[in-house]
Amino acid sequence: MTITGKLKSVLLTYSFIISINLLTTMSEASAPSGNPPPPPPPPPPPIEGLNKFKSLNSPPNHQLDNSAKVEQAQHTNKNYTTSNIKTQLSQSLEVPTPTGEFGKKYSKLINPKTSKQNLKIEFPNKIISLVRDELTTKYFAADIEKILTLFSKKNDVILSEAKEK
């Protein structure tokens, strides 16, 4: 097998693991669970010292012109929207508990309590660290063999642990 062929096999294995992750999370997300969606989070409470701070920094006559009021309202809405989006993003990263046959079969490979992007994020970092640790330009072909061997051993360990559970 050529070097490019070996690298292609690593990438194919990587894409297979990602597809398993996506299939299990997508099949579980599309299955009706019977539970209604959670209610939206309440708006953040007002800060007590904020009004006092605003009164200290306002003009002496305590009146704002219309442009300042509009700008202040837009700034407040922007902050609320940003925090609301961050909250929605953090909620959407949760993985539902597997219930279908396919999900149960492969659920041991994925920790449902972590985000579904966990595998996508960690896996390339593992490959990069293996390449950094093992790859030298002098023994390129031999080092590719080491990487593939370590990679296949890691996959075997993951799959055997999943089968045991």
From Swiss-Prot:
<feature type="compositionally biased region" description="Polar residues">
    <location>
        <begin position="54"/>
        <end position="66"/>
    </location>
</feature>
<protein>
    <recommendedName>
        <fullName>Uncharacterized protein RP084</fullName>
    </recommendedName>
</protein>
<feature type="compositionally biased region" description="Polar residues">
    <location>
        <begin position="73"/>
        <end position="94"/>
    </location>
</feature>
<feature type="compositionally biased region" description="Pro residues">
    <location>
        <begin position="34"/>
        <end position="47"/>
    </location>
</feature>
<feature type="region of interest" description="Disordered">
    <location>
        <begin position="28"/>
        <end position="97"/>
    </location>
</feature>
